[in-house]
Amino acid sequence: MLTPISIEKEHIRLINLLHFINEQNRWFTIKELSDYLQVADKTVRKYLKLLEDEIPPSWNLLVQKGKGIYLKKPLNESLSFVESKILRKSLNLQICEELVFKKNSMQSLAQKLHLQVGALYPIINQINYDIQSSHLNIKKKPLEISGREQDVRVFMLRLYCNIPNDYWPFPYINKQNITDLINKMEKILNVQMYTYSKHKLCVLFAITISRLLSGNTIDNVSGLILVNKNDDHYKTVASITSELQNSFGVTLHETEISFLALALLLSLGNSITTDSNKTLTSYKKTIMPLAKEITKGIEHKLQLGINYDESFLTYVVLIIKKALDKNFIQYYNYNIKFIRHIKQRHPNTFNTIQECISNLNYTVYSHFDCYEISLLTMHFETQRMLFKNNPKKIYVYTSQGCIHREYISALLEKRYNGLIKIVRNTIINLTNESLQDMEIDIIISNVNLPIKNIPIVQISEFPTERDFHEIKKII
């Protein structure tokens, strides 16, 4: 969902309808859908026709008198393709793009969008209200989104990255050129990012390039920490500045390098796939005592009786480090859908951890928000499920990083206790050969993978009851 702004009710209802009829492997009545969406039966039928136009040819939306509605889709295809198509049509998204990347007056923007000026005003006012939570506002002359430059960029990043299926709205910027530069930075740092983290960083680079080309630079030094020039992440970004200038015609000054260095650090922090100990060496010694203090306090409250080894504590260090850094680039990894899911599924653990964090020194707990609390909740719940279940050949591949992958793995082990064994080797670039070497029988993934000869079950970001049903059938 486009979390930083409201989107049209019709788009929201279409997406909600799609997810609702996909959650369970059964027929739904018009009345059920009407009650769920809180609209008339006639409106439900209209939405079903709209949905039929959006789904791929390989899917089938069956509507039969006396039976109801049933969504038939291949196991290896996800809802994200359809959700992405719907969200890209959002008028509010188009308006935000115009306000960030182009120069307009109210009259010229209304003309572009084929609207009357009077119809455009309330939409602009609603967007202005929505973006205040991102510390931004809309200026009328010229008509643009205004605020700290880094906040404007991260706002657009959140818009784009909440559209599934690797949305790339930059026809004038070759994504492969940016990907090559990020691959180069990975080699310098000897790390590998997960697919989603790399895509997100690519989008931020493209937004930064677009803003720099239109003369918008980060000059509020007091609002952005300047990374030490001897820091590995700063030096890594600095090493590609000449290539950025040659390829895109932009010059990165110290504040711009610091901004991208922090984004790089947050991207790596979200999904470390090389040796965590090696990657965290520079700040692990400083943060580990705090990680142990937090873990001890949470264990005292939850009474899980689990042995918290160094591997577990390393991820606590990772979450703390990310919390301390993210205030300089606010909301970089914020995911409201993820937070809601964790709070609803594990309310006691979430509230307990939130209470423990609030008891820390203000200079520490003030950096934590619901996102970090949710990550810690997922991490502790993963240990709880692993502790109570005996792992038993499935490979889980997700786009969201190590903690998310471990969480999904633990959910599956708990659900199919004794029926499956999760293989925990971390491989970013999966091949048929590597999977056969591990004797993998089934792959469970929330992204499309170019793998043949091994069954793939496509799941949602968090498995639905329908996903669990399909997995059970195949195992």
Swiss-Prot record:
GO terms for biological process: regulation of DNA-templated transcription. Residues 169-274, 282-390 form the PRD domain. SUPFAM superfamilies: PTS-regulatory domain, PRD. Keywords: Activator, Capsule biogenesis/degradation, Plasmid, Repeat, Transcription, Transcription regulation, Virulence. InterPro entries: BglG_antiterminators, Mga_HTH, PRD, PRD_sf, WH-like_DNA-bd_sf. Induction: By carbonic acid and CO(2). PANTHER family: CRYPTIC BETA-GLUCOSIDE BGL OPERON ANTITERMINATOR, TRANSCRIPTIONAL REGULATOR MTLR. Belongs to the AtxA/AcpA family. Acts in trans to stimulate anthrax toxins expression. It activates the transcription of the pagA, cya and lef genes. It also activates capB, a gene required for capsule production. This is Anthrax toxin expression trans-acting positive regulator. It comes from Bacillus anthracis.
